[in-house]
Amino acid sequence: MKFIKRLLVFSLICIILGVTTIFGFYFYVKSDLPDVATLRDVQLQTPMQVFSQDGKLIAQFGEKRRIPLKLEEMPKELIEAVIATEDSRYYEHYGFDPIGITRAAFAVLASGSASQGASTITQQLARNFFLSNEKKVMRKVKEIFIAIHIEQLLSKQEILELYLNKIYLGYRSYGVGAAAQAYFGKEVKDLTLGEIALIAGLPKAPSTMNPIYSVERATNRRNVVLQRMLDEKYITKAEYDAARAEPVLPKYHGAEIELNAPYVAEIARAWMVERYGEEAAYTSGMNVYTTVDSKLQRAANQAAINNLLAYDERHGYRGAEKELWQVNQPAWSSTQLSEYLSNEPTYGDMFPAAVLSVEEKSAQVWVKSYGVQTIAWEDMNWARRFINDDRQGPLPKSANEFLAAGQQIWVRPRTQDGAITAWKLTQVPNANTAFVAMNPENGAVTALVGGFNFVHNKFNRATQSVRQVGSSIKPFIYSAALNKGLTLATLINDAPINQWDESQGTAWRPKNSPPTYTGPTRLRIGLAQSKNVMAVRVLREVGLDETREYLTRFGFKLDQLPRSETIALGAGSLTPVQMAQGFSVFANNGYFVEPFYISRVENPFGNIEFSAEPKVVCHRECSSELDEFAEQDAASPYAPKVISEQNAFLTREMLYSNIWGGGEWSSDTGWNGTGWRAQALKRRDIGGKTGTTNDSKDAWYNGYAPGIVGVAWVGFDDHSRNLGKTAPNRNIEDDVSGAESGGKTALPAWVEFMSLALQDVPVQQKAVPNNIARVRIDRDTGLLTNKLDSSSMFEYFEAGTEPTEYVSEHVNESIYSTSSGEELF
């Protein structure tokens, strides 16, 4: 009896001491315990995602990759795997599990390794949200008390959902959704049992037990999880065996980017940081929907890069990127090649490769990610030697002339129906490019290419590169002339100018390119054929200051427009986006729209945080609505009208002729515009203008089609370097030779883009606005005629400006000439 009494007393003392100790610990740490009620409104750090307007993922920004999921969206097997491995008594304890700890301790003693977690899931959640990972007694005490508080606040289901979305699982992946994407490139619902078990085993050591770090460790840990699931009767023996037999592959899957638009993504990222701050932008799970259309963006990517590489290749091959081993040295092993090339960048569909052997008409190469491949002669016989921008060597007769074993080169795949059929020799271009597509009705930028490759160079040439625009400026000057009273039939003297510049003490002699002159020529032809001396004379008719002021209607700044007659030849400097904005005025019948890139921003719950409200074109009668907005002192939602509908129509007529020319070839009256290559589109609802700067340093094509304005630019980032010229190369399909220009160097990108963008878009009939007259004129004089033969044609005029004289009454003095400035001849 005495023994029993002593035992009871001892037990009572232990209980009292235990309770006292627990309360003592509790009151000691109480002031340091966080308010677990914050878990009710917790917002998990989730990266920002950037999408196209039609929902294609463009980019993801944020250190922590997380795909938040509801518990009901997670497979039952995943929940069971985590519970079996981390906390098999999860539904039986209240946050702290002494029995589980004891059992885990015995398991360690029995097996020598920890197959079961010592901390409950709730404790792990407490640690992840409120505590550090330092291994100290007081931290463990706090962890227990916080876990108990959490269990009182949240249901078991809520705790599980938070845990499975919060836990770190390696490779910047937080939560099971991100881990499924990172390791398997799948959504959680599509995981196999083996994949589920692998993810469920990661909380123990996510950095060292993931399959990318160690396939062996990941496999062993997965098998431990499967064994626990079998022990807990969550799976059958057959399911266990099948899951164990699944191979573990060490492959990392980043966020599944569906659309390549990195320059747009960077615009969105910078905009979000400026608007919301860096922390909120990167961690609040915002979904940013841009104005980019995935179809148009893919078309712009393809067109701009194909055109840039075509330019680069016709100028010749500059040689290998580097030499990995010399011909008389042992070749690298497949392991060396694979490891080396895996660390080299890939630029879009341009892959690094190593030359293994060279035959007379073929070469064997090792391509990054694709191993041994063969380059056929027809895929590399373009590679004559680059001498300088104006000179190329002779056509090669053998692959040995430009390739050797041990060289690192660049290759591109040829594809058919999505499958690779061959590999083509290529090179990283020295020149660069930009492309912009804009909706002229509201200013939405629907496609943007800022350069050859964002990884190669992050500078955005579409928005940041201010370049001389060359003849691209002429439509705006001719629009000013129409506003002044000139017409499409007005004759301007196409003759050389030689004017003395007193300030410089030299003669100024602007010339046509090519230097041919046709005498008195109609305004329509002058713009379509981009005649420089006519542009100068048109500028003089309007007046320099009046022209510069008029050009500000299109969004151009006065300080971008030189106060000299060189403005007529394109001495002004603008960005491709500004050019697209300017040409939108012609395309939309005279309205000024502002370019914008962000359509809306949604928070993780689908609520709209921001929605763009661009000023849109109003084609119907809006004057009553405008008066109403004025009375209410409210901003109008409509774009302001900056030129008349008639002016825009007549300018489009000249831009149409830049592509389609005019006259009849059968009667020797036919002529082409500088944009004639766009006739390949076989559409009569398009128009545009070439642009080539002095010494061909910049090449442009700017044009419109139904609902789209597109601008293509090609040039060197080094402003002093010109685009050069090439000799013919019969080994290049659709070869272009001679001096580079807007029509040769930029227009092909515009044509390829439009051919893709306008698929399934019906041709629009010409809409002639009110107050436009159509009369028959004489082709040579621009005066009225009664003749019905090839010497006559119909022309459009703003009502009241059509000619009143007939050709028989024509006298030479009706030709426009200028008295401004002293012309020597």
Curated annotation (Swiss-Prot):
Reaction(s) the record says it catalyses: [GlcNAc-(1->4)-Mur2Ac(oyl-L-Ala-gamma-D-Glu-L-Lys-D-Ala-D-Ala)](n)-di-trans,octa-cis-undecaprenyl diphosphate + beta-D-GlcNAc-(1->4)-Mur2Ac(oyl-L-Ala-gamma-D-Glu-L-Lys-D-Ala-D-Ala)-di-trans,octa-cis-undecaprenyl diphosphate = [GlcNAc-(1->4)-Mur2Ac(oyl-L-Ala-gamma-D-Glu-L-Lys-D-Ala-D-Ala)](n+1)-di-trans,octa-cis-undecaprenyl diphosphate + di-trans,octa-cis-undecaprenyl diphosphate + H(+); Preferential cleavage: (Ac)2-L-Lys-D-Ala-|-D-Ala. Also transpeptidation of peptidyl-alanyl moieties that are N-acyl substituents of D-alanine
Region (Transpeptidase): 413-752
BP term (GO), one: proteolysis
EC number: 2.4.99.28, 3.4.16.4
Region (Transglycosylase): 48-216
Localization in the cell: Cell inner membrane
Name used for this protein in its record: Penicillin-binding protein 1A
Gene of this entry: mrcA
